[in-house]
Amino acid sequence: SDNGIARLKAENLWMSLSKRFNLPFQVFRLSGIYSNQFNILKRLKDGEAKIIKKKNHFFSRIHVEDIAEVLFESLKKFPEREIFNISDDRPASSEEVLLYGIELLKVKKPETIEIEDLESEMSKNFYKDSKKVSNKKMKDFFKINLKFPSYIEGLNYINNNSI
């Protein structure tokens, strides 16, 4: 996507600067971030969630507590110049995650919208490409066991502790 190309150019510029001035440099590419305060369960309860129909559209996500753990570990083990994908172990469609949230909360299914009917350009752009990435390098390098290896553990925790 255009946004992805722009991000890659920015990463390359920063990497060049770090080499030029001999500075350590790490890039953390964050997947879709969710937390106890910002998540599909809250959107379902607030009546803001909609099912967006798009076949084979997957993206990776990560709970904010797992992001914090990775960043903490990066302070202890700081490679000279590296790029890491920060994500959980299970890319999933937004529909799959939303349906799991419905099951947890035992609420009615929200309105379904076909991808062609989205009005927001930002939403259309989001659903243009799948965004699933591998977290293998992150897990191997930092020796991390994610607290929330998938949205299932994350949403269960949020449901039991936050809402």
Stretches found by the model and what they are:
Residues 2-4, 29-33, 54-64:
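Glycine-rich "substrate-gating" loop/helix at the edge of Rossmann-like oxidoreductase active sites
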Residues 5, 62, 92, 133, ...:
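Residue-level signal for the nucleotide or nucleotide-sugar donor/cofactor binding architecture
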Residues 8, 21-23, 33-47, 65, ...:
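Glycine/proline-rich active-site loop of Rossmann-fold NAD(P)-dependent oxidoreductases
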Residues 70, 74-123:
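Mid/C-terminal beta-alpha module of Rossmann-like enzyme folds, strongest
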Residues 99, 118-145:
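Conserved C-terminal active-site "lid" loop/helix of NAD(P)H-dependent oxidoreductases
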Residues 149-163:
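Amphipathic terminal alpha-helices
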